[in-house]
């Protein structure tokens, strides 16, 4: 206006101004100089003194300029006008007191009228408005009505005010229409000064233009009036403001409500408002975005007033310069600061218009001076960009607003009006939301938010560059909140402006008495009003069809929800506020989401196109979490809960609700586990035990450790199904699989990996953790990264920061209670004053992933808008997104699509890291930063004792927990610092402190809270987990002195046992009846989640009462989870229509899982009735899927539980299992069906008449069934023939085997036993070798029942042997050609099975002839034994030998009969056959061994057959001998009884002995011949049995494939008294230690000989068994005949034809006819006659008589080897033809070593098996190992396993046990001629010392098969006895009905074995044999996995082969004869002379 020139002498100019002689223009010029150069104080004084001069100068010049303007109107005149108006303004400003007294009233009024004339240009009119407002400010109450009318007309567009003269407009006020007489004086007409010029820019909306000007000038001119009394400045503003309210507000806000008061708020929830009519007005030039508006009157004015009012609360505080990027901390010139401010302002404005700001640029923008004011609308020149010079004006304005209640109410009401705007005005709403956000989040509250009793004194002179708050605490909310003490650069500081100077405070204290002046309403009132008012945004009907507006609406709603969430988590609220919050959330949820089914279907699949679809997830989440949080803090009434129930149950068609509910329940279950059961679900005792075991035994520690750390980081998600280090897609655990419906929903989350930040930024190369995942990332580790660096991230991150975070978690685990910083306006939900861990937990969930830079940036809801077109951008970037994606960050996606119970994004691992935080305590000496110490859950104590009360016990009813729902509410209060100080020791409860408290050292952060920036608007999906968590240091109660929780009517807030229980129960039912859910998919999803929920409850139950140290068993838990609580829903679900099939299947599954567990509390009668009804209907259901589900999930334990009345379902189960077995689908539960059937085979003999539900009638009808057995066996037989699944076929065969044994034991003579045997026998040649092997095992087991078979099925044993022979004959050719070891192993098994059967039958039976049906032409009869040797011959020498009819044993067709069909059709399997070689985990880790295997394979069958042959030759008819079954082979060695050897073992001195020689026979057998002294002194004569014999005996020791045998032989001369001629000499060969075979023990009674019933009397038989002599022969008897009969009886091996005595004539030879036979007889008779005649004729001839000979004198042999040589000669060993097969052995030490080694090898298969006894309540190894006895049933069982042997003298297999009694005195032992089993029985072994316990554990633990007899009510766990072995566990559980349930646990690589299977139920009579057989088969299966494993006979054969190869001595005949004649130089026995 004026160019400033240096005028030194202001005084001169002053004088010239006052010089009246000067002309007006000169005086004006000097006046300007004075104004420009004088100090303001002097200027005020000058004007006061010379006001009339000054006004005169001004007025004169104004008149002049006015005249010249009218004439010329050039630009120069306009500039002069500006200059003179400058003087006018100075007059108004400097002389307010005079103007107030109406000085120059009319003159000034006239000038202003000229300026305000509507004909002027807009610039002049606007200037006029400004000056008019100055004048009015000075006049205040002294103005006239005319001025007020003018004020009311300043803004065009408003209705004219009414007066007595009619409506007043600005025109008629400036030029009043006076009806005067012509003669009267008239006023000069006021005309425009400067009319609009042609180039002037017009304004479209004059109303807005002038309204903005008016509002602006009202404020910025407040302080420009130089009042002597400064209070008048405030009064001036108040005057203008009050009239503005009076004249304009009623039009701008027609529905303004004056009753609304912050002090008596009206808290009625508003109604839904209909959608306004939106009109498109234009398209944005830059973004091409359509802009909409509504045609409501004054809508723009409303927006302007709101924005104007908001600006006072969002203005930057004093001295806070604009943030210029890169210039932080520097002092800049003001002009640069201003430029920067406007630049940033423009930049932001542009960004806002184009789109919402790029997140990475946010830090600069959000700190700038104008950032909060210029949004969306282009910032017009002046309105909101008020610079810092005017901040003082703003302070005054703010003071006025805060001066009295009416003004505070005005602000509140205008903000309410903002929430009522249409959504096209969202920008204004955002500002109001921002204001509320700051009010709520900042520490320093506005005065009216302070509590009424607060003094609110705050320091007013803190320099702004200092810390935000240096330990000065503002008292707020009745709590002391400690300020954070981090420093920060000045541009980040927001100092409070409403408590800045002392006078301001004092002013309030002065007026405090008056109610109007007492404006402190308290935080709660503001929160309540905000909650109510902000709900209007939700309650506006959305414009779903207009995408831009929908985006805006969504954004606004999310901003509000973010604040709600912040309040829920961080703000302390009273009961009323909580109730208000809940009511509003309820109403909002209901209003937004409730829609008709038609409307809902219309948007199905297009949810993102509607507001409801976009908000469903966040709304449900916020509502549920707020509800839980409220219950933790205050008592919530029953009515409110009922409302919640009615609302949520009416919204179940939202999938998001189901998912949110499931997440809530999942976390609540963790809370319940922690608070009620003291378990951490992510760190369960059983998991720990198995992990320790894995680390200890398997060497997998390192990898596992890492996994564990990764998982354990998050308590809330500790059992997430994958490790965070992997890809972001989470996998579901094997234990829980989702239904198709939910898997689809869950899979969506996998695609939602684009987050809000990375859409516009960089390609996603690196991925950074969301800050919600780990609260401590902004620490020194990452501090070096530049703050603005943009880093994209994904919402399902599995981030690069993970390892660091884990480390930080470890470091900070002690820092459980740092004070979190308060959130200022930019601070987000990331870090906040977290009242306790639960809040932190919610906060965690409220915010998933809000940081996009690696420095610690917070994320406050609201400091940033989401770009409106974000969905489009996202869709462009990620075409794979699902169609229903709302296009907002994944945290906003519907929970159903953003993760569910099964599929978690990886951030779920850390989503509740902070779950262990509690409220910041008051630590005086520490300043806390923003990083939060996060202990990993592995470090959390479990110290939370049981809160046990009667109401928490489970009772036997449908509802298992009784808690009064009236008193149920959960609470976890935001603990104040004071409270926290009281309990700061962390010994919150006695229980907890006893477990050890935790250090509380805080870890200060390197970043202050000022760095925490809002990055985006995410509502965290993890909200739940935060709400629901329990801190480890606020475990039970923070107030030990107080008694009960808020919920129970007490004062304790937070989680407690009762709270967790009631909350869990209520939330479980909050969806109402889940069966009322209409959408089948959602219904299925809910039931799928119920299955998972139940699994967690079951997991809790399984982990209760677990011994931690494995040394003591804890007592049974007092509280147990209510596992049956879900059954009413499940029962009802089964009755739904087929539309809900998936849900029904889940329900059936869960019913079965629930009821097949051991029931802690027995179900009551009503329950069981209902349950059985449902099972009855389900098992007979027409839908096979339902049947399959029940069978799958009931098997195998259903019948083993002994539920009362469970047998009522037997018929149903048999029918259903039969249906499954006969169905064509391979994926049906076939194995389960067979297991169920197999578990029933022993039942019919127990229940002869079984009452059961009738399966053919759907109604309930009980019938008595006697044909259950037939039905079961029919089904099992059918399955054993036709079952297409291999494993199921194996189980069916095992069931058949068990059933046959059961029937034999019960002597039922069941006709189908033969058919069952037929099926088993036919299965021997089945193509699948696993099945054939199982069949072979069944036959093997039946060997133990041979005696019973012989009685009840006398033909069967022989038939089985014949079938085995024929089957081997049938299989051998193909097996020899096969390259698969499995094929060969099968034939070997069949050979060994055949051997056992042969040994089990008496010789008579084996010698019976085979009646072949197929060979009529073959008249020769072969005995069974003959066929056996033929088939063995074929196996040794190859199947080609069968081509010779002489060597062919028997064919299958020969065996066909009525009882046996050898070619019965068996259906082949429909699944791939398993690999022939059972390569397991063990065998697969081998070095290449294929060549060795091939050699072994080739000889497998041959060597097995040779073993069988030698075994039969040695033992058939002999075993067991007098030494008992434990003695199979001789213990005698060459040094025993040898007078030439004094050594106790084989030693080289034997080679010097002349009485011993070593031979090899047939290259397979080692023979030692020793000559020893006879035993004359023995009673009965010893070996010679009293007969005359030589003085030396011969001992032959034979070592062959089947063992070592010793035979002693003596030469017999005759009876003791010789009468007549001497008897011819003969040799008797007998066994060394016994005279004749003795009967075996009773267990081998099958070996007893059965007498031949040939009609002879007993006497006659006895007679036959004595040697016939002349004295005993009667006259009519023939001596030779009797002798032949005697020989046949006593030595049956001498019989030429089996069973036919030697004295019976041979049958007629085939080649001789009857005539020829008669001729021969006649010839013989003729010769007899001739001889008789000759004797009679020549009897007395002398030459026919001979003299009597004397007996020769015996000669004593001189050779020590004489008798051996003699015996060898008699046996023909010295003959030429034997020369090739009889050789000498080299005598050397190696031979002795080899012999000793050979003798140490086992000659039978050996097994050692552990047996444990577990008594009731025993859960640890110590209790189990110290049992010294068991129940009677157990002892009977152990007795049945074998017979008790005395270990001190036991000569059989010892299995490592000691003879010195250190491992016990006796133990059960079982043996046959082929197998030895010793049982390591824990109760038989001493446990009286630690050493004996260790020894006991070593013996038992090293066994690979464990038999466990458990009488405990809980299932036995594998890890109780810690061992690396124990690969197979056979657990026996006695049942109430005296049957026994079998559980088999085996490692996965172990192949199938029988006869018992997992789930079998057997009778006590067959139990011991079954278990023993199963254990032996399990042991064999385990050995089959050992690489290069050799059977005992293979090993022995190899040793023999080695000895023969290396030690056979080839010799000439002469050398051989010499060595046989004299093995060594002869020398005398020491005592030889006596002989």
Curated annotation (Swiss-Prot):
Coiled-coil intervals in this record?
1713-1748
A Pfam family per the record? Rap_GAP
Q: Relate the protein's function as given in its record.
A: Catalytic subunit of the heterodimeric RalGAP1 complex which acts as a GTPase activator for the Ras-like small GTPases RALA and RALB. May interact with the HLH region of TCF3/isoform E12.
Query: Could you tell me where the Low complexity compositional bias lies?
Result: 894-911
What gene is this protein translated from?
Answer: Ralgapa1
Which GO MF terms does the UniProt record name? Answer: GTPase activator activity
What residues bear Phosphoserine in this entry?
710, 720, 772, 796, 859-860, 863, 985, 989, 993, 999, 1003, 1477
Identify the stretch(es) annotated as Minimal domain that binds to TCF3/E12: 1326-2035
Q: Name one GO cellular component term.
A: cytoplasm
On this chain, the residues bearing Phosphothreonine are 753, 777, 1001
Q: Which tissues carry this protein?
A: Expressed during embryogenesis. Expressed in the adult brain, particularly in neurons of the cortex and hippocampus.
Report the record's Gene Ontology biological process terms. Answer: activation of GTPase activity; negative regulation of transcription by RNA polymerase II; regulation of small GTPase mediated signal transduction
Ranges for domain Rap-GAP: 1795-2003
**Primary site of residence:** cytoplasm
Could you tell me what this protein is called?
Ral GTPase-activating protein subunit alpha-1
**Assembly mode:** Component of the heterodimeric RalGAP1 complex with RALGAPB. Heterodimerization is required for activity. Interacts with the HLH region of TCF3/isoform E12.
Q: Where in the cell is it found?
A: Cytoplasm; Nucleus
- Could you name the domain of life of the organism this protein comes from? Eukaryota
Annotated region Disordered: the residues are: 343-384, 477-496, 714-752, 807-834, 848-911, 986-1011
């Amino acid at each position: 206006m004026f160019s400033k020139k240096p005028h030194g002498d202001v005084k001169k100019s002053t004088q010239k101004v006052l010089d009246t002689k000067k002309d007006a223009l000169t005086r004006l010029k000097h006046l300007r100089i004075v104004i420009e150069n004088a100090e303001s104080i002097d200027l005020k004084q000058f004007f006061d003194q010379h006001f009339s001069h000054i006004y005169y100068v001004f007025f004169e010049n104004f008149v002049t300029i006015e005249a010249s303007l009218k004439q010329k109107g050039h630009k120069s005149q306009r500039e002069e006008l500006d200059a003179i108006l400058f003087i006018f303004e100075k007059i108004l400003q400097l002389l307010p007191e005079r103007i107030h007294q109406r000085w120059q009233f009319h003159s000034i009024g006239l000038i202003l009228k000229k300026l305000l004339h509507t004909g002027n240009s807009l610039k002049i009119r606007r200037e006029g408005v400004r000056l008019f407002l100055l004048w009015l400010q000075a006049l205040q109450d002294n103005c006239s009505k005319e001025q007020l009318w003018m004020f009311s007309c300043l803004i065009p567009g408003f209705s004219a005010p009414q007066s007595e003269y009619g409506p007043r407009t600005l025109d008629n006020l400036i030029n009043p229409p006076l009806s005067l007489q012509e003669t009267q004086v008239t006023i000069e007409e006021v005309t425009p000064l400067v009319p609009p010029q042609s180039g002037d820019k017009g304004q479209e909306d004059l109303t807005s233009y002038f309204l903005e000007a008016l509002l602006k000038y009202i404020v910025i001119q407040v302080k420009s009036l130089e009042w002597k009394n400064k209070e008048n400045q405030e009064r001036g503003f108040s005057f203008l403001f009050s009239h503005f309210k009076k004249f304009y507000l009623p039009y701008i806000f027609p529905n303004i409500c004056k009753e609304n008061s912050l002090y008596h708020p009206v808290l009625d929830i508003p109604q839904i408002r209909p959608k306004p009519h939106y009109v498109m007005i234009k398209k944005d030039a830059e973004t091409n975005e359509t802009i909409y508006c509504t045609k409501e009157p004054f809508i723009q004015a409303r927006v302007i007033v709101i924005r104007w009012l908001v600006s006072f609360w969002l203005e930057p505080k004093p001295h806070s310069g604009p943030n210029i990027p890169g210039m932080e901390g520097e002092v800049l010139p003001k002009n640069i600061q201003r430029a920067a401010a406007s630049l940033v302002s423009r930049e932001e404005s542009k960004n806002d218009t184009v789109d919402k700001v790029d997140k990475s640029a946010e830090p600069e923008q959000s700190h700038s001076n104008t950032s909060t004011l210029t949004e969306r609308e282009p910032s017009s020149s002046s309105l909101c960009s008020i610079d810092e010079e005017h901040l003082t004006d703003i302070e005054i304005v703010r003071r006025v607003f805060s001066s009295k209640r009416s003004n505070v109410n005005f602000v509140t009401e205008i903000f309410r009006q903002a929430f009522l705007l249409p959504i096209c005005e969202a920008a204004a709403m955002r500002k109001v939301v921002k204001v509320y956000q700051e009010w709520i989040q900042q520490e320093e509250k506005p005065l009216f938010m302070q509590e009424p009793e607060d003094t609110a004194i705050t320091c007013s002179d803190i320099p702004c560059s200092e810390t935000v708050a240096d330990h000065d605490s503002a008292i707020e909310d009745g709590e002391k909140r400690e300020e954070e003490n981090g420093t920060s650069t000045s541009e980040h500081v927001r100092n409070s402006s409403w408590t800045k100077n002392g006078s301001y405070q004092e002013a309030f204290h002065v007026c405090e008495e008056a109610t109007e002046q007492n404006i402190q309403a308290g935080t709660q009132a503001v929160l309540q009003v905000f909650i109510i008012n902000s709900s209007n945004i939700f309650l506006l009907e959305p414009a779903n069809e207009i995408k831009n507006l929908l985006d805006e609406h969504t954004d606004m709603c999310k901003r509000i929800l973010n604040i709600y969430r912040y309040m829920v988590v961080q703000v302390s609220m009273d009961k009323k506020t909580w109730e208000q919050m809940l009511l509003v959330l309820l109403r909002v949820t209901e209003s937004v989401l409730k829609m008709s089914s038609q409307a809902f279907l219309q948007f199905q699949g297009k949810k993102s196109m509607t507001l409801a679809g976009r908000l469903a997830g966040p709304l449900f989440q916020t509502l549920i979490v707020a509800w839980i949080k409220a219950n933790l803090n205050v008592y919530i009434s029953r009515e409110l809960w009922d409302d919640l129930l009615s609302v949520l149950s009416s919204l179940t068609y939202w999938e998001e609700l189901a998912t949110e509910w499931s997440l809530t329940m999942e976390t609540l279950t963790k809370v319940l586990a922690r608070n009620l059961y003291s378990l951490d679900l992510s760190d369960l005792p059983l998991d720990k035990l198995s992990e320790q075991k894995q680390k200890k035994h398997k060497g997998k520690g390192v990898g596992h450790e890492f996994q564990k750390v990764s998982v354990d980081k998050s308590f809330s998600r500790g059992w997430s199904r994958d490790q965070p280090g992997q890809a972001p897609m989470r996998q579901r655990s094997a234990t829980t699989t989702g239904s198709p419906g939910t898997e689809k929903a869950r899979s969506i989350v996998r695609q939602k990996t684009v987050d809000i930040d990375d859409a516009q930024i960089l390609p996603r190369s690196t991925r950074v953790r969301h800050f919600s995942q780990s609260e401590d990332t902004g620490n020194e580790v990452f501090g070096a990264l530049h703050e603005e660096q943009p880093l994209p991230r994904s919402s399902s991150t599995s981030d690069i920061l993970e390892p660091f975070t884990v480390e930080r978690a470890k470091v900070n685990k002690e820092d459980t209670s740092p004070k979190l910083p308060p959130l200022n306006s930019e601070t987000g939900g990331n870090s906040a004053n977290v009242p306790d861990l639960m809040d932190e937990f919610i906060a965690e969930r409220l915010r998933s992933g809000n940081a996009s830079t690696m420095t610690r940036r917070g994320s406050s809801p609201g400091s940033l808008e989401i770009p409106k077109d974000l969905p489009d951008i996202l869709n462009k970037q990620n075409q794979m997104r699902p169609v229903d994606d709302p296009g907002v960050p994944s945290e906003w996606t519907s929970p159903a699509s953003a993760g569910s119970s099964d599929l978690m994004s990886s951030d779920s691992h850390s989503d509740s890291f902070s779950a262990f935080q509690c409220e910041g305590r008051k630590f005086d000496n520490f300043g806390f930063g923003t990083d939060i110490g996060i202990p990993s859950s592995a470090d959390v104590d479990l110290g939370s004792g049981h809160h046990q009360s009667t109401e928490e016990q489970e009772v036997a009813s449908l509802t298992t927990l009784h808690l009064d729902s009236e008193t149920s509410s959960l609470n976890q209060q935001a603990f104040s610092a004071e409270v926290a100080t009281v309990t700061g020791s962390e010994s919150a409860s006695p229980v907890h402190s006893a477990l050890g408290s935790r250090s509380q050292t805080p870890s200060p952060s390197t970043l202050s809270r000022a760095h925490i920036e809002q990055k985006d608007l995410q509502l965290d999906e993890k909200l739940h987990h935060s709400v629901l968590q329990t801190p480890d240091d606020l475990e039970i109660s923070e107030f030990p002195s107080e008694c009960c929780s808020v919920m129970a009517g007490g004062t304790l807030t937070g989680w407690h046992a009762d709270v967790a229980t009631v909350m869990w129960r209520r939330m479980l039912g909050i969806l109402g009846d889940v069966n009322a859910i209409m959408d089948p998919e959602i219904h299925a999803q809910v039931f799928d989640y119920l299955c998972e929920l139940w699994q967690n409850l079951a997991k809790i139950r399984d982990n209760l009462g677990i011994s931690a140290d494995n040394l003591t068993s804890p007592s049974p838990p007092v509280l147990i989870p209510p596992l049956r609580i879900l059954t009413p829903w499940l029962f009802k679900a089964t009755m739904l229509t087929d539309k809900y099939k998936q849900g029904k299947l889940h329900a059936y599954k869960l019913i079965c899982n629930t009821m097949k567990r051991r029931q802690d509390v027995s179900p009551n009668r009503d329950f069981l009735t209902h349950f059985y009804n449902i099972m009855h209907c389900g098992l007979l259901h027409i839908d096979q899927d339902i049947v399959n589900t029940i069978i799958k999930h009931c098997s195998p334990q259903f019948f083993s539980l002994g539920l009362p009345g469970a047998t009522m379902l037997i018929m149903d189960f048999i029918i259903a299992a039969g249906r499954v077995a006969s169905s064509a689908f391979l994926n049906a539960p076939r194995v389960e069906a067979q297991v169920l059937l197999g578990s029933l085979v022993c039942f019919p003999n127990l229940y002869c008449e079984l009452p059961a539900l009738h399966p053919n009638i759907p109604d309930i009808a009980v019938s008595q069934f006697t044909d259950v057995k037939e039905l079961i066996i029919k089904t099992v037989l059918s399955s054993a023939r036709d079952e297409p699944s291999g494993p199921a076929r194996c189980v069916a065969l095992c069931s058949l085997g068990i059933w046959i044994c059961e029937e034999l034991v019960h002597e039922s003579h069941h006709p189908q036993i033969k058919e069952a045997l037929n099926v088993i026998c036919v299965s021997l040649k089945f193509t699948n070798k696993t099945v054939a092997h199982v069949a072979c095992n069944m036959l093997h087991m039946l060997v133990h029942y041979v005696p019973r078979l012989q009685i009840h099925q006398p033909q069967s044993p022989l038939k089985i042997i014949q079938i085995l022979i024929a089957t081997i004959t049938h299989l051998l050719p193909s097996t020899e050609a096969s390259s698969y070891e499995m094929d060969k192993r099968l034939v070997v098994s069949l050979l060994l099975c055949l051997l056992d059967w042969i040994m089990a039958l008496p010789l008579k039976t084996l010698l019976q002839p085979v009646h072949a049906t197929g060979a009529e032409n073959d008249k020769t009869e072969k005995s069974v034994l003959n066929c056996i040797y033929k088939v063995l011959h074929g196996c040794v020498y190859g199947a080609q030998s069968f081509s010779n009819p002489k060597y062919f044993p028997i064919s299958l067709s020969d065996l066909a009969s009525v009882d046996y069909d050898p070619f019965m059709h068996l259906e082949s399997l429909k699944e791939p056959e398993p690999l022939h070689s059972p390569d397991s985990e063990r065998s697969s880790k081998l070095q290449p061994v294929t060549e060795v295997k091939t050699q072994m394979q080739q000889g497998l069958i041959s060597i097995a057959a040779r073993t069988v042959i030698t075994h039969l030759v040695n033992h058939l008819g002999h075993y067991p001998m007098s030494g008992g079954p434990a003695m199979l082979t001789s213990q005698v060695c060459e040094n025993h009884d040898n007078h030439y050897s004094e050594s106790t073992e084989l030693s080289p001195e034997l080679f010097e002995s002349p009485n011993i020689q070593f031979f090899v026979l047939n290259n397979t057998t080692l023979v030692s011949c020793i000559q020893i002294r006879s035993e004359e002194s023995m009673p009965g004569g010893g070996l010679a049995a009293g007969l005359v014999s030589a003085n030396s005996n011969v001992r032959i020791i034979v070592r062959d494939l089947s063992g070592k045998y010793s035979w002693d032989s003596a030469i017999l001369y005759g009876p003791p008294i010789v009468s007549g001629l001497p008897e011819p000499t003969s040799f008797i060969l007998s066994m060394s230690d016994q005279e004749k075979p003795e009967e075996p023990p009773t267990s081998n009674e099958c070996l007893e000989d059965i007498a031949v019933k040939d009609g002879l009397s007993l006497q006659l038989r006895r007679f036959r068994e004595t040697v016939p002599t002349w004295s005993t022969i009667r006259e009519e008897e023939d001596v030779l005949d009797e002798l032949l009969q005697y020989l046949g009886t006593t030595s049956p091996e001498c019989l030429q034809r089996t069973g036919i005595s030697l004295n019976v004539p041979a049958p007629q030879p085939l080649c001789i006819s009857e005539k020829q036979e008669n001729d021969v007889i006649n010839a013989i008779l003729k010769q007899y006659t001739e001889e008789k005649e000759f004797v009679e004729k020549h009897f007395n001839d002398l030459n026919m008589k001979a003299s009597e000979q004397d007996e020769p004198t015996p000669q004593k042999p001189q050779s020590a080897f004489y008798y051996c040589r003699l015996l060898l000669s008699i046996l023909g060993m010295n003959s030429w033809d034997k020369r090739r097969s009889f050789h000498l052995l080299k005598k050397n030490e190696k031979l002795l070593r080899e012999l000793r080694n050979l003798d140490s090898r086992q000659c039978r298969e050996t097994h050692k098996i552990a047996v444990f006894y577990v008594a009731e309540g025993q859960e640890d190894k110590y209790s189990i190992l110290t049992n010294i006895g068991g129940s009677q049933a157990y002892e009977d069982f152990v007795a049945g396993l074998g017979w008790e042997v005395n270990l001190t003298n036991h000569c059989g297999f010892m299995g490592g046990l000691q003879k010195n009694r250190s491992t016990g005195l006796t133990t059960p032992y079982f043996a046959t001629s082929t197998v030895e089993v010793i049982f390591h029985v824990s109760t038989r072994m001493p446990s009286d010392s630690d050493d004996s316990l260790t020894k006991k554990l070593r013996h038992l633990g090293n066994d690979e098969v464990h038999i466990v007899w458990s009488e405990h009510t809980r299932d036995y766990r594998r890890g109780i006895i810690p061992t690396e072995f124990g690969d197979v566990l056979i657990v026996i559980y006695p049942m109430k009905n005296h049957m026994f349930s079998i559980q088999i646990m085996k490692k996965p690589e172990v192949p199938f074995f029988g006869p018992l299977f997992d789930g079998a139920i057997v009778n006590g009579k067959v139990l011991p044999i079954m278990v023993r057989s199963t254990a032996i088969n399990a042991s064999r299966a385990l050995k089959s996995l050992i690489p290069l494993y050799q059977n005992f006979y293979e090993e022995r054969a190899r040793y023999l082969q080695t000895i023969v190869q290396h030690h056979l001595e080839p010799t000439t005949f002469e050398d051989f004869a010499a060595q046989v004649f004299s093995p060594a130089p002869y020398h005398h026995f020491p005592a030889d002379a006596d002989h």
